[in-house]
Amino acid sequence: MIFEEFAKSDCYGMIFTFMWAFNQQSDWDYVEHIKDIFRPYGTEFYYVELMASQEVRLQRNATENRLRHKASKRDVELSNQRLLQDDAKFRLESHPGEIPFANYLRLANTHLSPQPAAAKIREARGRSLIPYPDPTGEAAHPL
C-alpha cells in the first residue's frame, strides 16, 4: 500500500483527500488505521475539513481541472447522482468539536477558490499551536 511505503521513506509531507462519513464507524476506523501506519515514524498529522454547499460541490464536480484529473468524475451525470445520494445517506460534515485530533482545521470554502483556501490552510498551519484536551491521549493542538 502506498501509505506504508511513504511512511518508511525520507519524503517530507503527504496530502491525501478522503470523503469522511462521520456517521459511519468504519470511516473513523479507517482514519485510525492510517494514523497507525505512520505513528511508529513519529509523523505529525494535520486534518483539514473542507465544507462547501451542495450547489457549489455540484458545480465543482464538472470543472475542467477536476474532470482531467479524476477519472471517476468524468461521467458527470453519474458523479452528480453519487454526490446527491451520498449527501442523503451520510453525514459529511463534522459537528463542531467532534474531531478530537491534533492540528485540525474546519474550513468553509463555499466562497473560496482553491488558491485562497490553500492560503488559509497554510496560514493556520503556521500559527502557534495551543494545547487543548485530547481524549485519545495524544498531544492535541488546534490549527
Q: What are these model-predicted stretches?
A:
Residues 1, 38-43, 71-75, 130-134:
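Glycine-rich loops and low-complexity Gly/Arg-rich segments
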Residues 1-49, 54:
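Glycine-rich phosphate-binding loop used to anchor ATP phosphates in small-molecule kinases
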Residues 3, 114-122:
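Short, amphipathic alpha-helical "lid/cap" segments that border enzyme active or binding sites
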Residues 5, 60, 124:
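Residues that form generic nucleotide/phosphate-binding pockets
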Residues 29-32, 61-65, 120-122:
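Short, glycine/charged-enriched secondary-structure capping and boundary segments
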Residues 54-61:
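Switch/connector loops and helix/strand junctions flanking conserved nucleotide-binding motifs
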Residues 63-117, 132, 137-143:
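Small-molecule kinase domains that catalyze NTP-dependent phosphoryl transfer to phosphate-bearing small molecules
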Residues 120-131:
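C-terminal alpha-helix
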